Amino acid sequence: MRLTVQSFQRKFDPTDPNVKQKMNDYSETLIQQIDTMSAVASAFSNFASMPAQQNETLNVVEVVELAMDIFNEEYIEFHSDSPKIISKIDRTQLIRIITNLAKNAIQSIPEQQENKSIIVSVKKELNNVLITVADNGIGIQPKDIDRIFEPKFTTKSSGMGLGLGIIKNIIENYKGTITFETEFGKGTTFTVSLPIINS
C-alpha cells in the first residue's frame, strides 16, 4: 500500500486530461489492498479457533500478490508466469498460508545478514498452481527437519505464526500439498501445490 501511495505521489499530474480515471484506478487499488489487510487481520485475530472454510473461486496470482503488499521488506520479490491462475480455496485461508510462510522466511534471515533475499512465485504446472517462498536465511537444522510439520512445533520463542502443522492441514483440506527443501546455512524453499480450475 505504501508503494502504491508513493507511486501515485510521483506520477500525479493535476493537469492530466485523464486525471479522473487515474484517480478511480488508484482508489480501486487502495480499496483492494485495504480489503486484503482486513483479511490478514482477521486471519491473525484468533489462531485457536479456525473459521469454517469456504470454497471461493479466485485468482491465486492476484491474492498472493496483494497479500505480499503488507510486507515492507525491500528484498522481497514477487514473480508469476501468468496474470491469472484460478483455484478454489478460501481467500482468508490462502492469505494465512502466504503471510505465514513469508513471515517465517523473514524471521529466518539474520538481521545483520547482507544480500537478503525472499522470492515468492506463482506458476501453473499441469493441473496445479505452485506457490513457492524461497529465502536465503539460515535454513532448517537437520535435527528439526522431521519435526517441521508437527503440531505446535516452532524454533522461535515468540511470534504470531500459525505453525506449519496447521498450515499443512489447511492446504490438505483443499486437496493440496506442501513440501520444502532446505540447506542449513543457505536457506529454505517451501512449495505449496493446489489444484486449479481450467478455464
PLM feature segments, named:
Residues 50-53, 86-89, 155:
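Conserved micro-motifs of the catalytic ATP-binding
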Residues 171-172:
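Detector for a conserved hydrophobic position within an alpha-helical segment of the HATPase_c
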Residues 54-68:
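A conserved beta-strand-to-alpha-helix junction within the catalytic ATP-binding
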Residues 60, 139-147:
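Short helix N-cap motif at coil->helix boundaries in the Bergerat
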Residues 1-35:
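Histidine phosphotransfer helical core of two-component systems
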